Amino acid sequence: TDAVANGVHAISGVVDT
C-alpha cells in the first residue's frame, strides 16, 4: 500500500521518507 508523507504519495511498495 502507498504511504503518504510530505503530502506526496509514495510509489506502490515504496514508503515515503
UniProtKB/Swiss-Prot annotation:
Q: Which GO terms describe its cellular component?
A: extracellular region
Keyword Secreted belongs to the record = yes
Q: Which terms are listed as keywords in the entry?
A: Secreted
Q: Where in the cell is it found?
A: Secreted
Main location per the UniProt record: secreted
Q: Does the keyword Secreted apply?
A: yes
Q: In which tissues is it expressed?
A: Expressed in skin glands.
The family this protein is said to belong to: Belongs to the Frog skin active peptide (FSAP) family. Septenin subfamily.
Functional description taken from the UniProt entry: May act as an antimicrobial peptide.
Q: What's this protein's name?
A: Septenin 1e
